[in-house]
Amino acid sequence: MPAENKKVRFENTTSDKGKIPSKVIKSYYGTMDIKKINEGLLDSKILSAFNTVIALLGSIVIIVMNIMIIQNYTRSTDNQAVIKDALQGIQQQIKGLADKIGTEIGPKVSLIDTSSTITIPANIGLLGSKISQSTASINENVNEKCKFTLPPLKIHECNISCPNPLPFREYRPQTEGVSNLVGLPNNICLQKTSNQILKPKLISYTLPVVGQSGTCITDPLLAMDEGYFAYSHLERIGSCSRGVSKQRIIGVGEVLDRGDEVPSLFMTNVWTPPNPNTVYHCSAVYNNEFYYVLCAVSTVGDPILNSTYWSGSLMMTRLAVKPKSNGGGYNQHQLALRSIEKGRYDKVMPYGPSGIKQGDTLYFPAVGFLVRTEFKYNDSNCPITKCQYSKPENCRLSMGIRPNSHYILRSGLLKYNLSDGENPKVVFIEISDQRLSIGSPSKIYDSLGQPVFYQASFSWDTMIKFGDVLTVNPLVVNWRNNTVISRPGQSQCPRFNTCPEICWEGVYNDAFLIDRINWISAGVFLDSNQTAENPVFTVFKDNEILYRAQLASEDTNAQKTITNCFLLKNKIWCISLVEIYDTGDNVIRPKLFAVKIPEQCT
């Protein structure tokens, strides 16, 4: 796709540029950082990083001096053996220096970057929020007791000299009143209405980035469970699809009510992988105050696009949502994967934002790479009876990213048992053949007492694909027959297409079930026929859209959307992450919207 094209072609790769809309929604969203800021510890780490830099500079000076000595020596002698030994010594010094840069400088520079861009802004924002809440409470008391009205305190307009803010050391966020959707149905509007009853609220949040113009924030992940969340993104400079990978953020935290009865997020623990350009397609599952994050590791680029050359390596990281001071391996821990049981598949990897736990077992959404010649499918099962131009072989040929690709892709789950002890492994479980389409990003989550599975529509079956999980192993889904939600598309697979064709295009826009009796769900979808634009928060049934709210202007480009719904003080709320092009600098960045599901239809 041409970089200069302002419309986003609806393809499976992130486009380089979006258009600058006429209407810009201002916000800064991302991740608040570590709630415990130990100022002395922070200073000591920064000092340690500074000392390391000085030591490395000294090493460089010594190496340069050695080279100068050798140059002088070569002018006065022909002893090539001595010169060779000296050069080998310098090579060893350079290798040691490079190793030290990778193992010592990189992480400490990342520490400084994280501290300056996440920790300090997060706690200043939190302190300001607490001050605003306190002053509002004081005003209410004075107004009630004294029978006159105090003007609101405008913190940023006070003509006083304010001291530098101290770290908010004593704050301990607690997840109160936040829970999963369980039990009996909640009271929500069940009727179709054109009234603007949805009131999306942009969550004001500080992005954990350097913030320079042109930084593209892509490949976002947002998982939520039991009042805790995991978040991840990749930063690129120069281009959203081919730019230089600067850093990947993987963090966890709590869903909070900051005093205004609107859910927000407070990040408590952040990890930045040392090699961000090798980490792809992370997925997170919560269990007992930890998030387990499973990622693909690749040195040849995206494993989906470079599957033939990808080694199949995976990485598991455990992050504590309530980290301890000096917690070390408790707070952030790399888990060894002794084996990967792939069955008949060549390679497998996580593919989708989040999964579920059942007892001691974690299930991550995944995709398997199967050699095309080993894929057995009866073409007579291809649903073409109502399609005039579709061919029986189209179902089979559309299972790869190209008709002649070496691998076909199948969705499924990766199972990880926490009780495996010293021999941890992941096991791939493939999805059943019913309503089969190419493997794509998916999500499995618990809602109202039963797991629900969503799979992105990346091929000819463009209608939303989700339903109750009947069995996990093997993975069998009772797919809903939805007729109102579809994704934009071009070529052979346009919006609302249901005839088997050979294509590979689509986007991840999941839905969260909020009422099981009436099968009502909520999510953000792109209300456009051909281009990825116009994100709209929508509450819908299988055959009817009940009510909706636009999150940006109609021509605002957007892509991936992730929605998680939960109870906050017995009210249904949803938080939606939206990849969106409306920041004013021609790059895509995610935003968070909080939406309360209304009880009344008026």
Curated annotation (Swiss-Prot):
Recorded topology in the membrane: Single-pass type II membrane protein
CDD domains xrefs: HeV-G
Compartment(s) where it occurs, according to its Swiss-Prot or TrEMBL record: Virion membrane; Host cell membrane
Annotated glycan sites: N72, N159, N306, N378, N417, N481, N529
Gene3D superfamilies: 2.120.10.10
Region feature (Head): 177-602
Intravirion topological domain: 1-49
Role noted for this protein: Interacts with host ephrinB2/EFNB2 or ephrin B3/EFNB3 to provide virion attachment to target cell. This attachment induces virion internalization predominantly through clathrin-mediated endocytosis.
Entry comment, domain topic: The N-terminus four-helix bundle form the stalk and the C-terminus form the receptor binding globular head domain.
Protein name as catalogued: Glycoprotein G
Species, as recorded: Nipah virus
Lineage: Viruses, Riboviria, Orthornavirae, Negarnaviricota, Haploviricotina
